[in-house]
Design a protein with these regions (language model features):
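Charge-biased low-complexity segments
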Residues: 19-202
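Hydrophobic h-region of N-terminal signal peptides that target proteins for export
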Residues: 9-18
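A periodicity- and composition-biased signal for non-globular, repetitive helical segments
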Residues: 8-9, 170
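Positively charged n-region of N-terminal signal peptides that target proteins for export
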Residues: 1-4
Length: 202
């Protein structure tokens, strides 16, 4: 009798293990808008393409259909390739940027994202005066690992990037009303918790 119960338990466990897992929710399955729990609305563009743009619906400069033109503070538009080539800037504290990613993603997510091609890029509009990212948008690979992350996730992500990341721009860029920044993030360079542990002294 005990053997029968044991065999039955093993069969039930095997059957449960064999059940296909539920497909991940895709919050960005179609173009349009989605809403975070705090009421923030995000525009979704490219849901049927390899990459999807997710940006705050209030964004003016980094929306999917926004102009890529830049302007001097006096209102003149940059006209030449040479002018655009002189605009330069970079994240001032790369460690702050990396820390946000470490906080936002679990080790399991990082491992999965390391295996994907171009999973995530962060675009932004930067105030050249203080280096603040006043607009942030996300371009994600159309992968379940990223489309299953809720609008609340991207809302928190956006807020932290705006609050904690600053850009250092060159003198030419400081003549502009705003400039654009783009960071294509390489998850293979993002350490896991185990990789952050101190190595034993030799």
């Amino acid at each position: 009798m005990k053997r029968t119960i044991l065999l039955l338990s093993l069969l039930l466990a095997a059957a449960a293990y064999a059940q296909p897992s539920e497909p991940a929710v895709n919050y960005y399955a179609k173009d349009g808008t989605v809403q975070a729990s705090d009421g923030t609305v995000y525009s979704v563009d490219g849901a049927d393409s390899p990459t999807i743009t997710i940006c705050n619906a209030e964004n003016r400069y980094t929306a999917a259909d926004a102009s890529s033109s830049l302007y001097y503070k006096d209102g003149r538009r940059l006209e030449t390739v040479e002018e655009y080539g002189r605009v330069d800037g970079a994240v001032a504290d790369q460690e702050a940027f990396t820390r946000i990613f470490r906080d936002m993603f679990t080790d399991e997510q990082i491992v999965a994202l390391r295996n994907l091609r171009l999973p995530l890029a962060v675009g932004c509009a930067v105030n050249p005066e203080d280096g603040v990212q006043f607009e942030v948008s996300f371009v994600i690979g159309n992968y379940p690992e990223l489309t299953s992350l809720s609008p609340d996730f991207y809302r928190t992500f956006e807020k932290r990037l705006k609050e904690e990341v600053r850009w250092h721009v060159n003198d030419f860029a400081k003549q502009l009303k705003y400039m654009f920044g783009l960071t294509i993030f390489n998850f293979r360079k993002l350490p896991l918790t185990s990789e952050l542990e101190e190595k034993p002294a030799e």
